[in-house]
Amino acid sequence: MNISFEKIAEAHRIPIIDIFNYYIENSFAAYPDKTFGYEFFDKITDNTKGYPAYAIKSDEKIIGFCYLSAYNPLPSFKKTAQITYFIAHDFIGKGIGTLALKRLEDDARNVGVDIILAHISSLNSESIKFHLKNGFRECGRFENIITKLNRSFDIIWLQKNI
């Protein structure tokens, strides 16, 4: 398996939204309760201006995406970014998330970011374990603030200083 990272571009619109919509429909990893149309890709590209954002490819097939975005748009927060990544469900557990995290950490340093935040559903135990294993620590928890599929759950905030 040959993994590569390609800057997010228009050609990635459909596979990226399809991957995200899979998680909307089948998990608590993505918070919306209804899938998005392909125009949602424009929101991703708007939110990632000035930050690294990639389609993840395996042998020319898009198998995920990852990006950093502003935690807060105020200039006083410029050293803090929020991380997002979704890997196609049939590629989970193959080290791709680790590659994506390392790539984004390296790029974060290059754009002056030294704190990365992740917010994760309390029902997504695999993601929580992944982040803790990779140097994140829990820094906050909002209890029962979201309801999806008739289940209320917490949002856990994790932080990594790089």
State where each predicted segment sits.
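A short beta-loop-alpha structural element at the N-terminal edge
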Residues: 2-16
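Conserved GNAT-fold acetyl-CoA-binding loop/helix
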Residues: 17-44
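Acetyl-CoA-dependent GNAT
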Residues: 35-90, 101, 161
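Glycine-rich acetyl-CoA-binding "A-motif" of GNAT/NAT acetyltransferases
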Residues: 61-64, 126, 152
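Conserved GNAT acetyl-CoA-binding A-motif
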Residues: 108-120
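Conserved beta-strand-loop-alpha-helix junction that forms the acyl-donor binding cleft
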Residues: 118-128
